[in-house]
């Protein structure tokens, strides 16, 4: 199918190299001469031309690389035994390294296993110790409750000993418990009289520490009476195995005294250092303090000391505890366990004899006393086994290396056999690539050289249009402009195709309003649609964000290609552009039956919309990748579905498979009738792919076509310039249209202006509301087709409105188009004195029409949508402007365009001259700077000018400015870039170079006004 691309870059891009795979013969316009050279003729020209210097250089590089490649293989073939020897050596080293690596992994695994077993034993030891601690604390509470809180006491030595023995199973880690009461010096005499014994010291007459917390049973006779002290802690209750410690003062021993003082001060259980028990095994004493009453957790130390009335101690046999634990955790691989008290610099062994060597793991033990530190050291009892896995793996690697060396030897002989054939094929390939590069550079150079003067031609034609011409001359100029734009469009298509094939086409990411882009596209094809009597409309879903981030130029190019094709191949009916999000389309597909639907914009049937969406899968090369359109995307991304529906001639079934093939036409008759190059749809498909989308279509001959594509864009976090105006807020409108799709389009444009809209299908319903007084709408928009269809009601409606003297009488609008204007229908508006709005509807055009009807005044005086000469003239009159461009034609065009608006223009043909003329102080109000110039480009010239201006501003701040700058606070000359290729990278470079904006070549009044108004409106000079 033939199509025409109306998007693409301008004519100022400097192309160095582009690659075009092929180009078919095409016709420009309706059948003039050849628009470009055919492929065969291009080949002839290329063969006749000498190879360019750059191509020759590349050919020499390619030839040199090939020669080096063949020489390298020849060297390998001649010295293959050295390579084989090196390979065997490398294989041996690799196998040895593998052995070391796997052996290290085995050791790491063994180390992790030891750590796991050691940590498990340490954890269980801590858990069992904590359980015993809890039971000791419960016993302390029992003593406090039944001994100190009862009068008389409910506990005596026999009761305590019996209870301790019967509950010993709850304290499997303790070998005995004892309770000592707190006695002051003043209470000692009475206490000893009540107990029947005197308080004794913990030390014997020999002043040596015993192996237990007091003398043994046979040492009672040698026990000494406790000398006077401030307070005492004599044992009054003890388990039978330790009842020999009854009457001994626990505060008389240094270790026990320190333990008791820390316990009653902290309110927690504390441990002693390891000591030998009566059974000659190491143990520790855990001490808890008994208080008169329950203390809060935040009690202070002195409060705890005052409330202390006794001390409960439990003796732990560490060796028995660890032995019991090891029996419970007997594993397949036994380990040696050693427990140490590491509180002091010299660790004290509490269990085990650390005589082993080798791998060791240390686990920290926490017995609840932060002042004591304990550790568990673990080692394997057996030596590690041989690392058979590492040995076999490394040996296997060595065998593989030897086999690979043998294969390498066979490969060398094989390569030597086919080397000559490969050399011949490489030479042929090199020649083909050289020819392809020459052809691509030729096409790119010729296209660029044609486009550059064409911009000058178009600019001069625009200037010629502003002179006094008669009707015939104006028609000639318009025809020349149309032909020039068609040629530029054709060149842009060729350059885009070359960019795509060379992989140099990139997308920009800038914020833009998609609704405004769609309106601009409708404005572009408005005249052609009206000439052919077609209904042209656009609808954008409310779920589409106001501002998106993407490449508006490429989206405009895709939609323009599709709409342009629809205009070209449609003779009656409509062309309908819609934009939705993917979720909306998917929900519609679930309920759509797929039957051909006549509920359309114009009433003509259209191709199956469902097949248009599903055909995206058909034209995807990989079937499984068709799910990518439905795959989840990032939260800031949005996937859009854009469709162009027409009621044209459709695409023959036999031609549908090659629609997206470059340079392919549906048939030879299409090229003769409609022209075109046949690459617009191919370019569109590539652009859609760059946007992470897909494109497909549904077409039925003599019914129409529906092209659908998806695009993934980003949501903009900034708010867009909503077109809604405060002047339309609170206004209600009624749309009368018997076609629901068309009514929805009208409602969409009204809602963009902030107008609340209601729909009705018949004029009778509107008349009924008018008669009943229930009509709240201030605006009534009636489609002309509905008006003519129900013409029997129109006289009654007009008379009703004329006789209505109310000030809030609704304004009546007729929505007309060439498609709804049969013979005689064009006089309808004049006959009934109605306001007419011509379709296709655009928000800006609708806004102006409604404002005029409501008695408003246009804010900007325009003619045919273009800023008038008077508006620009008021801004540029007598302004001193310098234009910098190395192209004389571009200088003339730019100077002529600015002089037309009253500016006084000075021209400079290089960046160096511009720097000289713009050295401050000077009299210029603004500068238009070309970006690409020889010697010094526009970016560098602008940077140097800004440096000179900053130097002057610093002098002004210091008060050293020249006299002509005495009244100036800050000097800055507006510099606008002149370019025809304003992509994102170019725009960013303009900002980096401190330019103030850009205008396209040739100048367009509307863009020129929007740029210069920022500097010249409301003041005479910007500095």
UniProtKB/Swiss-Prot annotation:
PTM annotation (4-aspartylphosphate): residues: 783, 930
UniProt note: domains: Histidine-containing phosphotransfer domain (HPt) contains an active histidine that mediates the phosphotransfer.
Highest taxon listed in the record's lineage: Eukaryota
SMART domains: CHASE, HATPase_c, HisKA, REC
CDD domains: HATPase_EvgS-ArcB-TorS-like, HisKA, REC_hyHK_CKI1_RcsC-like
PANTHER family per UniProt: HISTIDINE KINASE 3, TWO-COMPONENT HISTIDINE KINASE
Cellular compartments per GO CC: nucleus; plasma membrane
Ranges of the Extracellular topological domain: 102-387
Signal sequence range: none
PTM summary: Activation probably requires a transfer of a phosphate group between a His in the transmitter domain and an Asp of the receiver domain.
Topological domains annotated Cytoplasmic: 1-80, 409-1023
Topological type in the membrane: Multi-pass membrane protein
Subcellular location: Cell membrane
Organism: Oryza sativa subsp. indica (Rice)
Gene: HK3
Protein name: Probable histidine kinase 3
